[in-house]
Amino acid sequence: MSVISTLRDRATTTPSDEAFVFMDYDTKTGDQIDRMTWSQLYSRVTAVSAYLISYGRHADRRRTAAISAPQGLDYVAGFLGALCAGWTPVPLPEPLGSLRDKRTGLAVLDCAADVVLTTSQAETRVRATIATHGASVTTPVIALDTLDEPSGDNCDLDSQLSDWSSYLQYTSGSTANPRGVVLSMRNVTENVDQIIRNYFRHEGGAPRLPSSVVSWLPLYHDMGLMVGLFIPLFVGCPVILTSPEAFIRKPARWMQLLAKHQAPFSAAPNFAFDLAVAKTSEEDMAGLDLGHVNTIINGAEQVQPNTITKFLRRFRPYNLMPAAVKPSYGMAEAVVYLATTKAGSPPTSTEFDADSLARGHAELSTFETERATRLIRYHSDDKEPLLRIVDPDSNIELGPGRIGEIWIHGKNVSTGYHNADDALNRDKFQASIREASAGTPRSPWLRTGDLGFIVGDEFYIVGRMKDLIIQDGVNHYPDDIETTVKEFTGGRVAAFSVSDDGVEHLVIAAEVRTEHGPDKVTIMDFSTIKRLVVSALSKLHGLHVTDFLLVPPGALPKTTSGKISRAACAKQYGANKLQRVATFP
């Protein structure tokens, strides 16, 4: 079924069932709750659809509607309303006066948006953003909350029954060159089926589906859109939404919402699990039980085994089942999901010899191993999405334990980037494997840019190709380096290299977190941290650190999905724009 036909079916068969709930915390009048049933949602969607159909009635091409609005139910109605009208929706962040505003403006320009959908609250900021960053000042900006509900049914259902119906998902990478991934409704429905098959235990031949969804992830993000919109729509369960800001201000809200709703499904990046552990008190959890939680995905950034261990230990007293926590791997170029752990099994990890990993192949650590790297174990089988390890230079498939680029094949994979050069799209999305193993299609394959290896039905991720740090001819993975540094600094870390006359130099930038704040710590304390970090990297990794920066909490640049952007860190470092807490002798 298509997205819109599914919505129409929900509105017809279960019109009074709760569909979407938005928890708006910390407003001037206190916490507010906005609720919609399936029939109410369908009415709001058709209001948006009616406006867009009328606006684009004489168009000779498919129209595009960018959505740049606050997190909430208007965002949901805007996205679905554009699909319902046969338009191409483009989910984007709300302008908040930050660096990501440039990305929003450039994306509006890149997708040639015919209209921008927002709310009355954000309309002025949206107009200023698209005018400042190159989009036409004449692009109509429509406040979703001002549209009247029409009489009758305006959804162009037929437009939803083919692969042609699509949306653009802009990736959360560089702000200088935002790339819109073209995703069809077929891509989405395939990925939803893959998620249902791989995340939920099957009992009596049927999946044990969640009874609710809890999400604070931004709806403009690939994982936020899947968890906060597509999953509840196709499963037919209510979703409780709140904003990323509400979570950051009080991380305990996430655990509280999970405890208060029936068999919930949820997801978040790795850093959110660390925050939940550090910022959720016994008082916050008093009287709450997590024993009924269906699934919590840890994804969207590299999953750290220590984080999983600490999270399970912290919430074990509240009956959280280990098998409910699902480390996951995915990317926008394949809607979102690519791999997770085996259904019904708790998350596990394996220790490998770090020196062997640096040489390009995996060997289990032993009692004689000097340096070990612990990696999350994912499950790999012969069902789509297929995953193979390939030499990125020769395109030859690599054998068990050999580290290479992760390539993906499946019906959930996009056909390419919007407005991209044909050669780029062919190389990225239509790659061919040479000397493929039995049962492996020759093409088309998606090059992920990630490095990993396969052993049997186990799959491991070691890092990003572009972030690889090479020193003295040896490969070093930044995630491994950053894990070591965090043991001393406590905050988020970026390990990256800078080039000087063709020589690569390692730079470490670490957010310092102390009990009294960075302004209360002496230079002596900082010098001690630096000495310990430099010594550990030398002894454990054989690395020489050219520069070590301690920066205030929150100072490291991030992508729109909340991941530390190593490329942006390197760029700011080169321009001397990274704010230092202290300068070392």
Curated annotation (Swiss-Prot):
Q: Per the similarity annotation, which family is this?
A: Belongs to the ATP-dependent AMP-binding enzyme family.
State the organism of origin. Answer: Mycobacterium tuberculosis (strain ATCC 25618 / H37Rv)
EC? 6.2.1.-
Q: What class of enzyme is it?
A: ligase
What's in the keyword line of the UniProt record?
ATP-binding, Fatty acid metabolism, Ligase, Lipid metabolism, Nucleotide-binding
Protein name per Swiss-Prot or TrEMBL? Probable long-chain-fatty-acid--AMP ligase FadD30
Q: Does the keyword RNA-binding apply?
A: no
Q: Which reaction does it catalyse?
A: dodecanoate + ATP + H(+) = dodecanoyl-AMP + diphosphate
Q: What does this protein do?
A: Catalyzes the activation of long-chain fatty acids as acyl-adenylates (acyl-AMP), which are then transferred to a multifunctional polyketide synthase (PKS) for further chain extension.
Q: Which gene encodes it?
A: fadD30
**PANTHER family hit by this protein:** DISCO-INTERACTING PROTEIN 2 (PTHR22754:SF32), DISCO-INTERACTING PROTEIN 2 DIP2 -RELATED (PTHR22754)
Q: What Gene3D superfamilies does the entry give?
A: 3.30.300.30, N-terminal domain of ligase-like
Q: Name one Pfam family in it.
A: AMP-binding
The GO terms this record gives for MF are:
adenylyltransferase activity; ATP binding; ligase activity
Listed pathway(s): Lipid metabolism; fatty acid biosynthesis
Choose any GO biological process term that the UniProt entry carries and state it. lipid biosynthetic process
